[in-house]
Amino acid sequence: MEKHFVGSEIGQLRSVMLHRPNLSLKRLTPSNCQELLFDDVLSVERAGEEHDIFANTLRQQGIEVLLLTDLLTQTLDVADAKAWLLDTQISDYRLGPTFAADIRAWLADMPHRELARHLSGGLTYGEIPASIKNMVVDTHDINDFIMKPLPNHLFTRDTSCWIYNGVSINPMAKPARQRETNNLRAIYRWHPQFADGDFIKYFGDENINYDHATLEGGDVLVIGRGAVLIGMSERTTPQGVEFLAQALFKHRQAERVIAVELPKHRSCMHLDTVMTHIDIDTFSVYPEVVRPDVQCWTLTPDGRGGLKRTQESTLVHALETALGIDQVRLITTGGDAFEAEREQWNDANNVLTLRPGVVVGYERNIWTNEKYDKAGITVLPIPGDELGRGRGGARCMSCPLERDGI
């Protein structure tokens, strides 16, 4: 039985889940990229090469790298998992009962790696056998999608996040990402590495409509010492924060949750696009998130199964209290005002900490990387000319499965 525990943002990283760019990114076009939450189309081949360098950088540091497509393929070897995924992804109500049944039967006979490829990369009407005939087929173009691609699977951080002894399988805010959660639900329920695991499922693993209670892992920082920091962004709502906080307290996995309100705009879509924890007392930040007027609360158990809410004077003060340190050190995005805005857009603050003071980040952010170096933080640089166009850095593209506490 594998161990899955994430005790901090900065303790030694031991195991991580990544997703190499695949068919889903090949199906991004100028006409559909906005709907699929991308600003531009990427060179998939180059993005794949850059991702390989990222994965190999982690392996060279002794970190186990598991790939989402491999995990999904292996999960499909379990008959119950395959049946459940086909039922959830190919719905009678979406396609009609006869067409859905025909598609499920055809997909069920497909080699599992090819099926996994379609579960993330999508399926068009032009790819199904000509023998499958239906009014639904007759009224669609061959390039229309039966299953839309999931290019944001690249950002494995968001769909699920491990917090101490458990995982949140997150109800995603945008329709373009909501099917991602089903792939992760299947992996955590049936894959041999997780099926018999002794871990808690805090949130998101039920067949219900979570409505406004959305949560994404890019907003969740496990800062350690019984504390969790969560950003309330355009993707994570106060409702989602409350549900997760209550579950953490119920299972005695956290003593406090710090909730900070973020600006609701694209460049600040998740907390980790503007703030990451990189050493015991050190955070990388875009200055906007630590302004004195930013609203911040600490949630603690009220002793009756509910939440006690305390308004904090500043986010920095809340962090110092939670971590038991006198003064938090902030490394702000580098360069002048123009360079800092450009580098934040290119994920200069979105670094993946491998152990205290050692991070992986894009080599293109020269001004911020220089500030890290002067502050004693080691940056292992990776190329990101194509990956970075998806608006996610090393932290966004990684889901830690095992990491030491502090």
Curated annotation (Swiss-Prot):
Paired cysteines (S-S): none
Coiled coil: none
Metabolic or biological pathway: Amino-acid degradation; L-arginine degradation via ADI pathway; carbamoyl phosphate from L-arginine: step 1/2
Active site: C396
GO biological process: arginine catabolic process to ornithine; arginine deiminase pathway
SUPFAM superfamilies: Pentein
Any GO molecular function: arginine deiminase activity
Matches recorded under Gene3D superfamilies: Arginine deiminase, L-arginine/glycine Amidinotransferase, Chain A
Domain of life of the source: Bacteria
Compartment(s): Cytoplasm
HAMAP family per UniProt: Arg_deiminase
Name this protein carries in UniProt: Arginine deiminase
Originating species: Salmonella typhi
Protein encoded by which gene: arcA
